[in-house]
């Protein structure tokens, strides 16, 4: 027999508070239409697996029961502007819209990391992670003074990407992996 995931009789539904403020306006005999919305959603009690139990205890994270501890925030705005008119027998309409939304992991039960950039808490949901670039190697002097790169067995040539040693330990390794670029969900 094998041991499976433990149950948790105390789990509950996730909770969400949503706020939405909108304005709609029509002008110039209803030819110009403007719609603007601002929204915010705060979610708490998100069901997640605790990442705070060290592996030294011999308990696999997959066998730990899920608990309601996650907290996220999402907010943004939407703006739609439309113009509709008629010239003779020709009817036309033009419209354009823009939306912006940014989310953030406010709290996630995760193991302590030595550097803040290694956490999910404080960053966007689905944030991409990778090595931070500081341009390209342009001179032999830059190549000679670079940190040891554990990902490439320290091979580098002129024109290769120059990565940043974020923690200053002289190595380019998994402790230098940080949030880069935009998250998986576009903001605009």
Please name every model-derived segment:
Residues 16, 52, 72-74, 136, ...:
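Short capping/connector residues at structural and topological boundaries
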Residues 2, 7, 43-46, 65, ...:
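Glycine-rich, flexible loop/turn motifs
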Residues 1-33, 62-87, 124-129, 181-187:
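Outer-membrane beta-barrel signature, preferentially recognizing the C-terminal barrel domain
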Residues 67, 86-183:
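Conserved small-residue
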Residues 1, 51-58, 165-168:
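Short amphipathic alpha-helical segments, especially helix-boundary/capping motifs
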Residues 39-45, 51-67, 175-187:
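Active-site beta-strand/loop architecture of penicillin-binding DD-peptidases
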Residues 50-61, 109-119:
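Flexible, surface-exposed loop regions and adjacent strand-edge segments
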Residues 13-58, 92, 99:
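Membrane-embedded beta-barrel scaffold of Gram-negative outer-membrane proteins
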């Amino acid at each position: 027999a094998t041991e499976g995931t433990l149950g948790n009789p105390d789990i509950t539904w996730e909770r969400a508070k949503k706020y939405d403020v909108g304005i709609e306006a029509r002008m110039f005999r209803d030819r110009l239409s403007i719609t603007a919305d601002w929204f915010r959603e705060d979610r708490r009690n998100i069901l997640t697996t605790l990442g705070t139990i060290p592996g030294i205890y011999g308990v696999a994270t997959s066998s730990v029961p899920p608990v309601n501890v996650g907290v996220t925030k999402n907010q943004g705005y939407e703006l739609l502007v439309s113009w509709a008119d008629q010239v003779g027998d020709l009817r036309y309409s033009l419209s354009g819209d823009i939306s912006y939304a940014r989310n953030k992991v406010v709290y996630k039960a995760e193991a302590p990391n030595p550097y803040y950039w290694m956490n999910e808490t404080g960053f966007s949901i689905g944030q991409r992670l990778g090595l931070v670039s500081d341009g390209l190697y342009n001179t032999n002097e830059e190549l000679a003074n670079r940190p040891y790169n554990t990902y490439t067995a320290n091979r580098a040539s002129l024109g290769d990407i120059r990565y940043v040693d974020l923690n200053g330990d002289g190595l380019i390794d998994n402790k230098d992996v940080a949030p880069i670029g935009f998250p998986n969900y576009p903001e605009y």
